[in-house]
């Protein structure tokens, strides 16, 4: 009987499930759409009961379509978005809707913390910045605006922690994810009550479940879950992975010469390093990586291809091929039309919002699409340039995410950055990485390093056109000037209001 490992991947828009054999060969993938709720402007929520129903359904569909039985699955892992807030009450029931990482309701709280110097106080301990989608920001918002709900909190979790609890009935917070929550002291490798005290949320210390490892077996499929999903009761479930970590694993990032860019709802640039550094040029975000003594370092903002998805939804049906053809039909780096990809947040200040600038009657849909492609790449460059100060010997960027399927977009990224672009040929990095964690946890590999060496994926390469690079650098500078001008505008508005 062939053995398989199940990897679940819970993202912003889809819940996916993939099956892989001992050698990493895919036996099937199923996906179901996820619904994000926005009861008020700037809010992003998810019905927790509905998410669990979706999880059970996607597992059942995977088993049905693949012909694999629950008896053949010997380990399960979960990869998921980071941050956000999934709460259970003191009776172990979902406490309202989950709040997603793209939620912005806590903006005033974050702004107040910034004015009070809290981020500078936290950073040496947590190695995190402070923003609206962090669990701590959302917890403080609940304390101030929904005190009755806050008082009922029995357990604080994030996405894959909640799904793991649904599968096993065992609570825990997985380390690669909780280490980027501002609840975790990066040097100590554990929760730190000083942090919740400084943030004014010390009441939830009792509700923080144990920290668990990515490949640690945290529980087993319950009898009830087995009936509902078709899985076998007693199947081990490992801690899982923050999706950014899963992607870095699948991209084969293992030294300081290569970075990983994830292009999805979020623009994320990641690198792997040993040890923490003090006195760096920027407050880089660190997180615990899967190998002992290693950390993932990244820069991120919700400024990537989610902007294109929104735009195409407004225009009606247009295929990815049609978009690429439209963008490719125009001169590279031509014109002065700009798009600011800040529909879901920005990397240029809390007040910055999205929009086109420089639009005239001569512009067509193709020009707008090209501006979106360029704006997303320019926003990625903000993070990439900062990361290249930290990883000064980088010569290669490995890219994953939907835009990696567009040679037009990837060539643009190569031309703007001047870097060698490598495209790992792995389709579902979340599912594959989660199943990889399960294989490590069930003893197929001694550790993630051995697994990564054994499962290297083929890579496609694109090289930059350095003539076009010079043209794009000029346009990128104009983009930066536009950002600076708008920052000045918002500063003057703020002064006037105050």
Question: Model-predicted segments: where are they?
Answer:
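Structural signal for short hydrophobic segments within the conserved structured cores
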Residues: 28-32, 209, 460
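Short beta-strand-loop/turn "lid" adjacent to the catalytic site in phosphate-handling enzymes
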Residues: 64-100, 129-133, 164-185, 210-215, ...
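N-terminal glycine/serine-rich phosphate-binding loop of ATP-dependent small-molecule kinases
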Residues: 1-97, 124, 152, 226-227, ...
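Active-site core segments that coordinate phosphate-bearing ligands/cofactors
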Residues: 5-7, 107, 114-126, 131, ...
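A conserved helix-loop-beta module that forms one wall/lid of the active-site cleft
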Residues: 200-213
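Carbohydrate-associated surface elements
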Residues: 103
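Short, basic and Ser/Thr-rich N-terminal targeting/leader segments
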Residues: 11-13, 72-74, 79-81, 135, ...
